[in-house]
Amino acid sequence: MHELSLAQGILQVALKAAQQGGAERIMTVYVKTGAFSGVVPSYLDECFTLMSKGTPAEGATLEVEEVPVVVRCLECERESQIERADACCPHCGSSQIRMVHGRECFVDRIEAE
């Protein structure tokens, strides 16, 4: 379960941002995860809740938004969203594609007071 290490990293980023902004309490952490990142949002939320106990993020809400998978075709150089890992370019049919977005996991922003 890599959600535990991701939750730890998310918590560290949120705590640092809150401290730099002079906030005492984190209310919401907004996270973006790629559709092919393998992140299970409910597991990530459970891990974040567990790891944030006793910190300014205790009780904070974790809002996870899934980012669609975007690939660039190496043949026609167009970008497209795909839903399957075995997809080809929807424009030219080439299987020569490179993922641009879809595996990321990052803190987009936080709400704190």
Features from the language model and the residues they span:
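Long, charged N-terminal interaction/targeting segments
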Residues: 1-60
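Short loop/turn motifs enriched for small/polar and acidic residues
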Residues: 32-36, 65-69, 110
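Short, flexible, mixed-charge glycine/proline-rich loop motifs
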Residues: 61-68, 78-83
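Cys/His-enriched microdomains
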Residues: 71, 87, 105
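Short cysteine-rich clusters marking metal-coordination/redox-active sites
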Residues: 73-76, 89-92
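Short functional micro-motifs and their immediate structural scaffolds
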Residues: 81, 94-98
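Short metal-binding segments enriched for Cys and/or His
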Residues: 97-109
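Long, contiguous binding/interaction regions
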Residues: 113
